[in-house]
Design a protein with these regions (language model features):
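Noncatalytic alpha-helical scaffold of FAD-dependent oxidoreductases
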Residues: 1-166
Length: 166
């Protein structure tokens, strides 16, 4: 778990940064208490604010060294209507790793997240969950998430990703 102030202070990303980017991308305004005790207001509810220095993004990621956030204005996105998770097994690590740039640079598909697990991580996860996810020799696994509003488009995208993984 986390708090939004910490996310902004660290400019956190997380697993879905592949598609959605880091926290700073969505910060449109801040109220900050400076180390001197002064309260400053940066940005706000305006869509276009291009005059002067970009102090919002100077503060975002400053880890609290430039001030403490007391108000944060965030641009929110609607939740995607549909989500698909693909679990792809590979014989070895190098094959799994080679697929990731193919997917990312393909251009027509932006995965929400791409998570890599080597054989040891897969085995430990299976033990912990008391599950058996695969048969045969698996050297690595990718968990690829895609999301969107059009189910047919998602089906098309995961079929393309599946072909890239072969």
């Amino acid at each position: 778990s986390c708090f939004i102030g910490g996310n902004v202070a660290e400019n956190a990303g997380g697993g879905r940064a592949v598609k959605y980017g880091v926290t700073g991308r969505y910060i449109i305004g801040l109220e900050v208490v400076t180390p001197e005790g002064e309260i400053i207001h940066l940005g706000g509810k305006r869509v276009k604010d291009v005059v002067g220095y970009d102090l919002i993004h100077l503060m975002v990621g400053s880890e609290g060294t430039l001030g403490i956030f007391t108000k944060i204005y965030i641009k929110l996105l609607p939740l995607p209507a549909k989500k698909v998770n693909l679990l792809v097994l590979f014989a070895d690590i190098s094959t799994a790793v080679a697929v990731v740039p193919k997917i990312i640079t393909f251009g027509k598909i932006i995965p929400t997240a791409v998570e890599f697990m080597d054989k040891t991580a897969v085995e430990l996860a299976c033990q912990y969950l008391n599950e058996h996810l695969y048969s045969g020799e698996v050297g690595a696994m990718l968990l690829i998430e895609i999301d969107g509003s059009d189910e047919n488009q998602l089906v098309h995208e995961y079929e393309i990703i599946g072909e890239m993984c072969q």
